[in-house]
């Protein structure tokens, strides 16, 4: 990341007497149509990014450090924001205090390689359940659980030799996966490579996402879905 000219001056100018925390702006020099993996994380843009955030020493002392268990993209930012909200910190913004953040090209199948971060959502939910439901995900991702249930039904039907049950499970999986694929394509880049990426990863994401949610729930001992 590269600070823009006047970054510190603009930040200090926006830091009023009653301000506890000031957030600058992070800008990408070549904004592009988002790839699917950038929208699959299940979270909105963090309202606070520690990479461009100014905080009074007294507030940092009151926070008593950071939870180092959050070691995956944006979760540490969200957790800091939630803690500041709970302590009723006065948060201001300075859009002129800008940091430039170049975006590297995403590799093929990036969505799958990002899914392990979902396990940290369980910890975020355990520490801040109400804020998590208000600001991150209001309801569990039932779509993914329904797709996994369809896979289980299809497999059980095949194992039991029940063609009707197997066909019902396969049909439900196909319809639900197609709906997921269409939703992920909406507003995303439409290159041939990216479309192929979405077709493949849409079939693999639901079981992988459910797996990592279960791992997170077990690791952090919380009922989380």
Locations of regions flagged by a protein language model:
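Alpha-helical elements of Rossmann-like donor-binding domains used by nucleotide-donor carbohydrate transfer enzymes
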Residues: 6-10, 79-83, 120-123, 209, ...
């Amino acid at each position: 990341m590269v600070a823009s000219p006047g970054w510190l001056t603009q930040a200090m100018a926006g830091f009023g007497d009653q301000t506890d925390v000031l957030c600058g702006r992070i800008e990408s020099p070549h904004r592009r149509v988002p790839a699917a993996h950038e929208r699959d994380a299940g979270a909105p843009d963090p309202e606070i990014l520690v990479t461009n955030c100014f905080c009074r020493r007294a507030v940092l002392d009151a926070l008593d450090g950071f939870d180092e268990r959050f070691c995956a993209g944006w979760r540490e930012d969200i957790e800091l924001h939630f803690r500041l909200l709970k302590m009723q910190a006065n948060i201001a913004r300075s859009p002129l205090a800008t940091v430039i953040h170049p975006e590297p090209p995403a590799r093929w199948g990036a969505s799958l390689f990002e899914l392990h971060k979902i396990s940290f959502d369980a910890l975020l939910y355990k520490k801040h359940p109400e804020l998590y439901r208000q600001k991150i995900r209001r309801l569990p991702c039932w779509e993914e659980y329904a797709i996994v249930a369809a896979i289980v039904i299809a497999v059980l039907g095949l194992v039991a030799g029940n063609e009707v049950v197997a066909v019902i499970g396969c049909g439900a999986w196909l319809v639900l996966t197609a709906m997921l694929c269409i939703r992920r394509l909406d507003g995303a880049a439409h290159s041939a490579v990216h479309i192929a990426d979405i077709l493949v990863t849409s079939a693999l994401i639901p079981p992988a996402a459910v797996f990592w949610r279960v791992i997170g729930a077990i690791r952090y001992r919380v009922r989380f879905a």
